[in-house]
Amino acid sequence: MMQLMLYASTLITSIILFKMNHPLAMGLMLLIQTIQISMLTGLMAKSFWFSYILFLIFLGGMLVLFIYVTSLASNEMFSLSMKLTTISLFIFSMILIINILLDKSSISFFIQNNEMQSIYNLNMFLQENSLNLQKLYNYPTNLMTILLMNYLLITLIAVVKITKLFYGPLRPMN
Amino acid sequence: MLMMFYWSLPCFLFLMGVFVFVSNRKHLLSMLLSLEYIVLNLFFLLYIYLNLMEYLSFLGMMFLTFSVCEGALGLSIMVSMIRTHGNDYFQSFNVL
């Protein structure tokens, strides 16, 4: 039931994102979607490590929005329409009602045994999918980690070289 | 019911991100944010796929690192364009 509610809310978030115009509102939707997807991936595996990393990375990407909005798009309004909210709540409740009508066992946890719990936690494919990262630093695949380090360093240098301009302010010019 | 959503949800979210990307937005940052949205949903799909493998989940880390690097490069291109041309309107790209 928890996962189904998360699925329905991700669908609603994607539909709301489709109607957004302002970058700040799109960033807010992206942040909500990141929280939902990290909760979903945490529920699929046995530990929340990956979802923690995902949330921190995308939250760091959101920090650029504030300087953007304060310097470039400071005079734009954004509004959430009432019709869109009504349609979203309607779709959300429709998905929940259809699920309850089709599958009555998904609303009650206490009648399930252990195998059914594992089905509803959606890690039924492998018994041992604890998503461990022990190949990250061992020999045949640590070369990919070294490649990642070099790529990050080259990206750092490239970003500094691209944004090294000594003319023009960071503000809109109409 | 849940298994019906299991693989089709990230594909649907990916398609929604692609629709947001190709719909004509005003700012360049909206395009970059929709690209981040596509990357997020592709990471979700990759995570579901790597649940089937046993020890390959470090590929998700690699995917996240590459996506972060490309996002940083896109933002640096946007900053450079703002400082040279004054705005980041997507409609004025054919003038550049």
Curated annotation (Swiss-Prot), chain A:
GO MF annotations, alphabetized: NADH dehydrogenase (ubiquinone) activity
Localization of this protein: Mitochondrion membrane
Residue intervals passing through the bilayer: 24-44, 48-68, 82-102, 143-163
Domain of life: Eukaryota
Keyword Transmembrane helix assigned: yes
Keyword set includes Zinc: no
InterPro entries for this protein: ComplexI_Subunit6, NADH_UbQ/plastoQ_OxRdtase_su6
Gene Ontology CC, one term: mitochondrial membrane
Protein name: NADH-ubiquinone oxidoreductase chain 6
Organism: Ceratitis capitata (Mediterranean fruit fly)
Lineage, highest ranks first: Eukaryota, Metazoa, Ecdysozoa, Arthropoda, Hexapoda
Swiss-Prot record, chain B:
Mode of membrane association: Multi-pass membrane protein
Residues annotated as transmembrane: 2-22, 28-48, 58-78
Keywords, ordered alphabetically: Electron transport, Membrane, Mitochondrion, NAD, Respiratory chain, Translocase, Transmembrane, Transmembrane helix, Transport, Ubiquinone
E.C. code: 7.1.1.2
Catalytic reaction annotation: a ubiquinone + NADH + 5 H(+)(in) = a ubiquinol + NAD(+) + 4 H(+)(out)
Listed Pfam families: Oxidored_q2
InterPro entries given in the database record: NADH_UbQ_OxRdtase_chain4L/K (IPR001133), NUOK/Mnh_C1-like (IPR039428)
Enzymatic class: translocase
Record-level GO BP terms: ATP synthesis coupled electron transport
Keyword Manganese: no
Subcellular location: Mitochondrion membrane
Listed GO CC annotations: mitochondrial membrane; NADH dehydrogenase complex
Molecular-function GO term, any one: NADH dehydrogenase (ubiquinone) activity
Predominant location category: mitochondrion
Protein's job: Core subunit of the mitochondrial membrane respiratory chain NADH dehydrogenase (Complex I) that is believed to belong to the minimal assembly required for catalysis. Complex I functions in the transfer of electrons from NADH to the respiratory chain. The immediate electron acceptor for the enzyme is believed to be ubiquinone.
Family: Belongs to the complex I subunit 4L family.
PANTHER family: NADH-UBIQUINONE OXIDOREDUCTASE CHAIN 4L, NADH-UBIQUINONE OXIDOREDUCTASE SUBUNIT ND4L
Official protein name in the record: NADH-ubiquinone oxidoreductase chain 4L
Species assigned in the record: Ceratitis capitata (Mediterranean fruit fly)
This protein's encoding gene: ND4L
